[in-house]
């Protein structure tokens, strides 16, 4: 079953390779969507894929790459848009 979630991640997640880390894992898991930095230091992402794959990616995002320190994650289900890839929005 395909699900879609919007995730807002807070903590030390900018300047540590967090978007690249998430993109690499998303593509490996077959998750589609996007990720971007937010003003103020957080990161926002939309994840679309099989429930198991999205759940696994959320776990990886909670850990983050070395140098990151995730202090919070807000997760909400959203309408699926049929993304065809996972990309970083600049």
Curated annotation (Swiss-Prot):
<feature type="active site">
    <location>
        <position position="19"/>
    </location>
</feature>
<dbReference type="GO" id="GO:0003998">
    <property type="term" value="F:acylphosphatase activity"/>
</dbReference>
<feature type="active site">
    <location>
        <position position="37"/>
    </location>
</feature>
<dbReference type="InterPro" id="IPR001792">
    <property type="entry name" value="Acylphosphatase-like_dom"/>
</dbReference>
<dbReference type="Pfam" id="PF00708">
    <property type="entry name" value="Acylphosphatase"/>
</dbReference>
<dbReference type="InterPro" id="IPR036046">
    <property type="entry name" value="Acylphosphatase-like_dom_sf"/>
</dbReference>
<comment type="similarity">
    <text>Belongs to the acylphosphatase family.</text>
</comment>
<feature type="domain" description="Acylphosphatase-like">
    <location>
        <begin position="4"/>
        <end position="90"/>
    </location>
</feature>
<dbReference type="InterPro" id="IPR020456">
    <property type="entry name" value="Acylphosphatase"/>
</dbReference>
<protein>
    <recommendedName>
        <fullName>Acylphosphatase</fullName>
        <ecNumber>3.6.1.7</ecNumber>
    </recommendedName>
</protein>
<keyword id="KW-0378">Hydrolase</keyword>
